[in-house]
Amino acid sequence: MRRLEGSMVAIVTPMKDGAVDLRALRELAEWQLAEGTDGIVPCGTTGEGVTLTPAERADVIRTVIETVRGRALVIAGAGSNATHEAIESVKLAKTLGADAALVVTPYYNKPTQEGLFRHYQAIWEATRFPVVAYNVPSRTSVDLLPETVARLAKAGAIAGIKEATANMDRQVQLVEKVGKDAIAYLSGDDFTVLPYVACGGHGVISVIANIAPRAMKELVVAARSGDLAGALAKQAAMAELNRMMFVETNPGPVKAAVALLGRSGGELRLPLAPVSEASLAKVRDAMVRFGLKLA
């Protein structure tokens, strides 16, 4: 298995007139590769995976894999709050040739820690494919605790975790209970890349990399190489732009930002609505101040 590390983009899913725009997706993926991105993660939260049909998800993942052609990691979004559906999604990712699958904790039905353990264990037993668990309690109302992560790692059921709690004490606990390099630790928060890496993280699955991939790659490289001053300067420079990516619900602002770069339309799928004019102005101003060239 390839090492799951570096600067990865939670890539948006371009849409046009209500349909997935695969041509624009290919162009975005090629641009990411040219900018040095280490991995592409299609069909995640930012990629609106939950509102894609099964056929659309397959098309998106296949398009990314065919475009990348082994030049970067592909970690396919494959989560569900039904274990049997998650298993089928992971099987699809495996069949299509992804490097791993990103599997969010089951949402809405609020399983216990034992339920979470059995969920990921069942996926591993049915697929024998590398899974990155995705812990984002702010969206799922479920928190995958370090003790459970340690059980899963010991059982070989997960290859990594995308941790989106923005809690550095949590990352310290994970390293303590699971082991420094036992699994891949990937930040799910662009705001905390530097401290996350300093606490044992191996990289990030990033939203802002959709519009500033080279800047995010440089931040990750600086943080991982121990260039504290350089990494701190890069993290601080991104702060406002990071905040504006969440001025409304993700991926609304980042899709609007991608459109402002002229790289695809900013169309969203319901129930997500376009960002307001006021929010769009904030996003545009932050992009200009960061030095991005608008279309």
UniProtKB/Swiss-Prot annotation:
Site (Part of a proton relay during catalysis): T45, Y108
GO molecular function: 4-hydroxy-tetrahydrodipicolinate synthase activity
EC id: 4.3.3.7
Enzyme class: lyase
Alphabetical list of CDD domains matching this protein: DHDPS
Gene3D superfamilies in alphabetical order: Aldolase class I
Keyword line: Amino-acid biosynthesis, Cytoplasm, Diaminopimelate biosynthesis, Lyase, Lysine biosynthesis, Schiff base
Residues annotated as binding pyruvate: T46, I205
Any one of the GO CC terms: cytosol
TM segment ranges: none
Cited SMART domains: DHDPS
Pathway: Amino-acid biosynthesis; L-lysine biosynthesis via DAP pathway; (S)-tetrahydrodipicolinate from L-aspartate: step 3/4
NCBIfam families registered for this protein in UniProt: dapA
HAMAP family: DapA
Name of the molecule in the record: 4-hydroxy-tetrahydrodipicolinate synthase
Lineage, opening ranks: Bacteria, Pseudomonadati, Myxococcota, Myxococcia, Myxococcales
